[in-house]
Amino acid sequence: MKFVLLFGVFLVTLFSYSSAEMLDDFDQADEDELLSLIEKEEARAKECTPRFYDCSHDRHSCCRSELFKDVCTCFYPEGGDNEVCTCQRPKHLKYMEKAADKAKKFGGKIKKWFG
């Protein structure tokens, strides 16, 4: 009985050590992958089209606002036959960003009061 108990403790210790080593390897791989994704995102962010600028050359190139990506909206100006496309923020997303900003400010006040 003592041998079985000792053998069980040895197996649990060996398993926990090996799983900790594997988790460290996975964490390192995830960290390297995350760094490469951040570098790609920074490179891509420099090429975005600002709000109210022409986006007809690439309709998916609009810049991000604080929370959401702007949308390339196309329309025909009054009295014109040519289609005009510009990066714009839809109104519902504008209101959602304002609400999120107010919630952040309110959360900061609560943290200040009780923190």
Curated annotation (Swiss-Prot):
Propeptide: 21-44
Disulphide bridges, residue numbers: 48-63, 55-72, 62-87, 74-85
Record keyword Glycoprotein present: no
InterPro entries associated with the record: Spider_toxin_CSTX_knottin, Spider_toxin_CSTX_Knottin_CS
Keyword Cytoplasm attached: no
Membrane-spanning segments: none
Signal sequence extent: 1-20
Tissue specificity field: Expressed by the venom gland.
GO molecular function, one term: toxin activity
Primary site of residence: secreted
GO-annotated cellular components: extracellular region
Subcellular location: Secreted
Pfam families the record matches: Toxin_35 (PF10530)
Keyword annotations of the record: Disulfide bond, Knottin, Secreted, Signal, Toxin
Family (UniProt): Belongs to the neurotoxin 19 (CSTX) family. 01 subfamily.
Free-text comment about domains: The presence of a 'disulfide through disulfide knot' structurally defines this protein as a knottin.
Protein name per the record: U3-lycotoxin-Ls1g
